[in-house]
């Protein structure tokens, strides 16, 4: 495939890119790159971004059993990751939260699964095509489910409350 792309570049601009999974994967990569200068495998544990593929990627962290919790957004690692990562993310030693628009093997394995609206259909925003071109989308119709942003905002608020000692019983929609 790479040889074909090279040959075709003699006549036109041609690139070979892997097909991406569901969700706005290209958008996530673009935002991480824009905010940190690194495309993936970014670690913020020291308070600043550090890049080290082979050490800081999700697969690496899960395979080494270093994560005690995982929040998976619009992705299906249980269907796609290597066996050691899947075994850890589905174990009792790693609390799994799935935030997704549909049911997946990951949402089925999760300790907590939250269904969200579909961006570009129920929620507006910017998505990136697989060739890195941003597209602004408006919602076509309403959804009974909250957006990813609404869920993550409430989750962040709750974590901050718990961190500050304000224990509450539940998070309402």
Predicted regions and their residues:
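Non-catalytic alpha/beta scaffold blocks inside enzyme catalytic domains
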Residues: 1-173
């Amino acid at each position: 495939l790479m040889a074909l792309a090279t040959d075709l570049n003699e006549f036109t601009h041609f690139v070979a890119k892997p097909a991406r999974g569901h969700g706005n994967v290209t958008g996530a990569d673009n935002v991480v790159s824009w905010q940190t200068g690194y495309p993936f495998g970014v670690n913020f544990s020291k308070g600043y971004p550090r890049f080290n593929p082979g050490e800081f990627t999700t697969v690496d962290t899960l395979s080494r059993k270093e994560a005690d919790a995982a929040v998976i957004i619009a992705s299906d690692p249980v269907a796609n990751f290597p066996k050691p990562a899947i075994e850890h993310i589905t174990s009792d030693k790693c609390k799994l939260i799935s935030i997704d628009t549909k049911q997946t093997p990951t949402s089925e394995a999760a300790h907590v699964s939250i269904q969200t609206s579909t961006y570009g259909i129920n929620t507006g925003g910017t998505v990136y095509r697989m060739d890195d071109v941003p597209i602004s989308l408006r919602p076509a119709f309403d959804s009974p489910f909250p957006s990813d942003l609404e869920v993550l905002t409430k989750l962040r608020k709750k974590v901050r409350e718990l961190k500050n000692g304000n224990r509450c019983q539940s998070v309402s929609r």
